[in-house]
Structure formats: structure tokens, C-alpha cells
From Swiss-Prot:
Lineage, broadest ranks: Bacteria, Bacillati, Cyanobacteriota, Cyanophyceae, Oscillatoriophycideae
PROSITE patterns reported in the protein's UniProt record: RIBOSOMAL_S19
GO CC terms, sorted: cytoplasm; small ribosomal subunit
Native source organism of the sequence: Trichodesmium erythraeum (strain IMS101)
GO biological process, one term: ribosomal small subunit assembly
Job description of the protein: Protein S19 forms a complex with S13 that binds strongly to the 16S ribosomal RNA.
Official protein name in the record: Small ribosomal subunit protein uS19
One of the record's GO molecular function terms: rRNA binding
InterPro entries to which the protein is assigned, alphabetical: Ribosomal_uS19 (IPR002222), Ribosomal_uS19_bac-type (IPR005732), Ribosomal_uS19_CS (IPR020934), Ribosomal_uS19_SF (IPR023575)
Family recorded in the similarity comment: Belongs to the universal ribosomal protein uS19 family.
Keyword line: Ribonucleoprotein, Ribosomal protein, RNA-binding, rRNA-binding
Length: 91
């Protein structure tokens, strides 16, 4: 279920302040964040945000197509190592 339109998108306050400060200075800098649930807004386009995946910060470059999605969608938390191999075929 989507969020109510009257509430607006969720974005962490500390992240919004950092984005606005960088936009005011016209700088590009990597921003570290643990806020995977923050929605990507148009002000973030062109910035690189390092999103925490539980182990490390994954750098995510924000493009136009990402607006409206959550930051956590672009930093996978699980590593897939493949299914177990068939031991009979190795003999």
C-alpha cells in the first residue's frame, strides 16, 4: 500500500539537510547514510549517496529514473552465492 499523498514522501531530516547544504554550495560529495527507507526526491539527482546494506556502504549515483523509489532498493542486503552443486555429477 502506498503512502498517503497528504503526508508527502518520507525522507530523513539529516539527509535532507545535507542534500540542501550541498545544493546551496553547488558541490558534489559522497553522503553516507543508514536511512534506507528515505524516498529519492528530485533534489538528490546527480548526487552520490552511500547507502548502508548491513555490512558496508554501497555508493549509489542518483539519476532521474530513481526519483520516487527508496534508497534501500539500490543497495542489496543479501549476497547470492549460487545453489549447492550436484555431488554425483562430479564423480
Amino acid at each position: 500500500m502506498s503512502r498517503s499523498l497528504k503526508k508527502g514522501p518520507f525522507i530523513a531530516d539529516h539527509l535532507l539537510k545535507k542534500i540542501e547544504a550541498l545544493n546551496a554550495k553547488n558541490e558534489k560529495q559522497v553522503i553516507k547514510t543508514w536511512s534506507r527507507s528515505s524516498t529519492i526526491i528530485p533534489d538528490m539527482v546527480g548526487h552520490t549517496i552511500a547507502v548502508h546494506n548491513g555490512r558496508q556502504h554501497v555508493p549509489v549515483f542518483i539519476s532521474d529514473q530513481m526519483v520516487g523509489h527508496k534508497l534501500g532498493e539500490f543497495a542489496p542486503t543479501r549476497t547470492y552465492r549460487g545453489h549447492g552443486s550436484d555431488k554425483k555429477s562430479k564423480r
